[in-house]
């Protein structure tokens, strides 16, 4: 272990600071004890094998220290190394930190997130690493230890780490921070510039930026781009835990359903703000953080107000007939399919098994994530202890400007939390990959299971080749 008593200078930009400088500015001076620092030289074996640059800390600083005198554990991602992407070693350091938290029980865990998501050069090793981080965050919360996410770095927080952020108890963002699932470059490369113009910076920040995420309810605090402001936010949010419970997730589900009902038809952040009742939404982007909080508070509360919404965002669907499912349940099943999403149950030798999942390469958007979470929560509520089979055949998250505008990463984080609640309540969860299993289509469901199995021909992968080529700058 390495001790470092350095401190961040006053009024230091969070966005421009390095990962280590952010962490040192967050924690009390002289209390930081870093684990597996650069001197340990724990590096990615995959990058070395590919002849790519390595970092001696693999792009993440993990440490323990004190925050206003209280013991905390913290991790800070380095966006300057491979865009803060998470590979096998990077992910293992985060998982180890979260497991240590459950053992030593600090005041909480603070994650300084600056990441483009899965390290594409490590492919499925990175995908599995992110799924393990997601599960570790939820297990730490379930153990009664709050996890706070801070998003204000230059790379934002995207991909699987965008879901990880929404698995935290609470999030603080700056205006400059960005949070989402599919980044603007990925959406443009996959769906075209007509769907989302990644070069339109104003549009990108209206869609992903801290101001929109604050009104939407995806961020709990909006702060200035200042290390000290993020430190104060961490102190405040550690005192506002959201335990993983049936009541907490039921309320979160109602809020997400109300958001979809109210803002589902909006095409731009200004439209969302207008629907929420914000006065002069066009001028909100021009305000500083303090003025924005004052002007947008009413809209934030209005958008978060619970209301009467449809319980079935996809409809009831129709009976699902599939030889593979018939073979799994020769005694019969009542599984129904709607827009490629499966819900129902099957009769096994040991009793009834709940079934949720995807079929036919379905893309998972906000409606699908909400429907899957509703089914998992219904099983927990109505059928205590019933085993849960998560079937996955999905080309991943639906890549659209609308889904990112609504915060699809938050809907998928909610689904992951619902699966974790089922596990905590004694439901055995088994994931079965039957076809494509891509990114957001597998992370919050299949990879959250107690056991994950794959049928012959199943194809877990990270991202479409054109988008990977654009992000990595490596020709497809």
Model-derived regions: residue spans:
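N-terminal short beta-loop-beta anion/metal-coordinating cradle
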Residues: 51-68, 333-349
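STAS-typified acidic loop motif
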Residues: 67-91, 345-369
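Structural beta-sheet core signal
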Residues: 111, 149-151, 355, 390, ...
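Conserved catalytic cores of soluble enzyme domains
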Residues: 117-249, 396, 400-476
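A structural preference for long, well-packed, hydrophobic secondary-structure segments
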Residues: 142, 358-386, 417-427
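Amphipathic alpha-helical segments at domain termini/boundaries
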Residues: 1-36, 188-342, 470-476
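Short, glycine-/small-residue-enriched flexible loop/hinge segments at domain edges that mediate gating
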Residues: 105-122, 383-403
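A short, well-ordered alpha-helical element
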Residues: 58, 86-106, 338-342, 365-385
